[in-house]
Amino acid sequence: MITKLPPTSESNNSLSDELLEKINAYWRAANYLSVGQIYLLDNPLLKKPLSIKDIKPRLLGHWGTTPGLNFIYVHLNRIIKKFDLDMIYLIGPGHGGPGIVANTYLEGTYSEYYPHISQDAEGMQKLFKQFSFPGGIPSHVAPETPGSINEGGELGYSLSHAFGAAFNNPDLIVGCVIGDGEAETGPLATAWHSNKFLNPAIDGAVLPILHLNGYKIANPTILARISQEELKSLFVGYGYKPYFVEGSDPQLMHRLMAETLDMIIKEIQEIQTNARKNGIVKRPIWPMIILRTPKGWTGPKEVDGKKTENYWRSHQVPFSDMKEEHIKLLEEWLKSYRPEELFDETGKLFPILAELAPKGKRRMGDNFHANGGLLRKNLRLPDFRSYQLEVVTPGVVEAESTRIMGSFLRDVLKLNPHNFLVTGPDETASNRLTNLFEVTQRRWLAEYLPEDTDGGNLSLEGRVLEILSEHTCLGWLEGYILTGRHGFFSTYEAFAHIIDSMFNQHAKWLQTTLTIPWRAPIPSINILLSSHVWRQDHNGFSHQDPGFIDLVMNKKAAVVRVYLPPDSNTLLSVTDHCLRSLNYINVIVAGKQPALQYLSMEAAIKHCTAGIGIWEWASNDKGGEPDVVLACAGDIPTLEILAAVDILRQSIPTLKIRVINVVDLMTLQPKEEHPHGLSNTDFDEMFTTNKPIIFAYHGYPWLIHRLTYRRSNHSNIHVRGYKEEGTTTTPFDMVVLNEVDRFHLVGDVIDRVPKLGYLAAYTKQEMRHKLIEHKEYIHQFGEDMPSVKNWKWPYGKE
């Protein structure tokens, strides 16, 4: 299909015939290099007839999307030069990796980052061989690819990353290609609404380019099979102004794309000028492109008599059985790009074509924003000690820990007005972070109603961004952080699972960047999990799931951290530490409900610095040997352990108890497995080598066993945690259902301390009676017993 140019006076001004031919040649060069990466081991310039020895034994990669990506790249290069734009290129269909590698090679960036891939025939041969080859580079737009901040392995995140990159980056334009397969994913579908949060006065611009090539792996795409009228209505409904660039004839398509981009850039600049100079700040109708090109454009039209170009068969490798006729077909395909017109005898791109690329940091492969660590500025942080809660006696004062954390984050926002964002799925208020609204508001560029002034906290320039999509919130934050800024994401613990695989992708990205010297460290992603399992008694079973921690702990120690601060002062210390860190995903689990507070700020700092410690004030074994070790991790398990200690002290005063609290789960691992891990000597000194250990843990109990299985006293560790028992009930009944309550814990101690035996029979019977009383009470009154609800630590500091 060929779409004629619109009859505008500018049609002939965007591209002269000479420039059109150069752009087409540059595009041919990118396509040639892309095919070469997929197929060739040697003979990069086809100086001799192609033979089986020149071809890789395992053919890997994706051709179908690549020529379209190359087409877009060369046209973005043109407008970067014409308008002197600061622009980066995000690739949703990241399986088109050979195209981006090809273009960064053509512009010279690739050889600067990888000098052994030189701008000659030898370098080209290495470029071809390394692609999807052992010891080489991945098939996707991975961290190894200059200019990339979105690998596009798992689809769906390109557009939210693009908007995240544009927030607070007023001079940046983000060209974002969304594949028509990717457009079928949930995260991408929601991310279109990001335009309701982009403020043209203070943010950059995003240019979405929906690439319709018609097919996924072996299936048509939905958006390519609906009418243009329906497609246009869809994106007009999303709030965009779609421009259609459709066809298969390169000459017409180059002219149409150039004309369209010129109009769009002028439109973007007009929107920004109106907002920045004329003070017209409202939600604009941002332009976008719907680009329809054949899948596998310029590739073989048929292979073995079967349609290939403009069909799903071109998605990956159009043919891989390298029989004689296929070798001939590959040679014809490569020669169709006329490489002798593109590269000189040495294999270098002709200067007349090389001059089409932007220079220096204007090249998309070398743009600072695509290596955001180079732009990173350390946060200005207030002294977290200033927000401390006065704790004179442990376990007496109550406070909402996340509310105190919110005061600290409020002032972080205040001190960092241009490089710190808070995102979340409409849970900022629920998670007790409302103090943020003392210095900022929720970003909102959609419609306003009069009642919004009554507690709506909406603003055109707010730095709290909320949309009821965990994917979009985290995508914004990742894009913001990948371009060198800082941020914070809070969500309900159970629903963090929505971003499980998204977390995986970022963790893999971080892990890979650690091996790439030119990738500068970026700020950490900081995730608060609140409204957690033990205080979701009111919402019920669907809201009760602490398993996100398990997922995080599967990742390499080099890129993840998990913290379970038991009170507000430890939470402040942990938060300050996380905001200062680089190249991590930090997960903090903290409750929002009123809870007992245990440590002074001085004690909290020492405890958090170590990550684990004996609480002397809760123990009575100092100067001797404990009979039992009671360990805890998490605010509610800590409460229940301390309440169990109280019962044991009263009923069995001769029992020697050591209480250990864990803030940093990684300390439980051996030092050889994690840098925060305790040495075997330190672990044994703390936990003993032969005493029973009762461990009350916030999440699923087997994680503690997994972390400690190599410890000498592992056989004596008995873990209580969440075991998928829950409903709508009372807070204390939640721990009873999962046997993490004080009464079950006392029973565990009695069962596992050999010397107690018959001596503690009466105490154990009393615990059974208490559990019966508990059930009867909540069923009659609908709330927990006063003795439970009002319990406080009765022993002071000693």
From Swiss-Prot:
What domain of life is recorded for the organism? Bacteria
Which cysteines form disulfides? none
Q: Which Pfam families match?
A: XFP, XFP_C, XFP_N
Q: Does the keyword Lyase apply?
A: yes
Q: In the Enzyme Commission scheme, what number(s) does this protein have? A: 4.1.2.-
Note whether Lyase occurs among the keywords. Answer: yes
Give an example GO molecular function. aldehyde-lyase activity
Q: Please list the cofactors this protein needs.
A: thiamine diphosphate
UniProt-listed GO biological process terms: carbohydrate metabolic process
Q: Which UniProt keywords apply?
A: Lyase, Thiamine pyrophosphate
NCBIfam families with a match to the protein in the record: PRK05261.1-1, PRK05261.1-2, PRK05261.1-4, PRK05261.1-6
Record-linked HAMAP family? Phosphoketolase
* Entry similarity comment: Belongs to the XFP family.
Q: What is this protein called?
A: Probable phosphoketolase
Species this chain originates from? Protochlamydia amoebophila (strain UWE25)
Its lineage reads: Bacteria, Pseudomonadati, Chlamydiota, Chlamydiia, Parachlamydiales
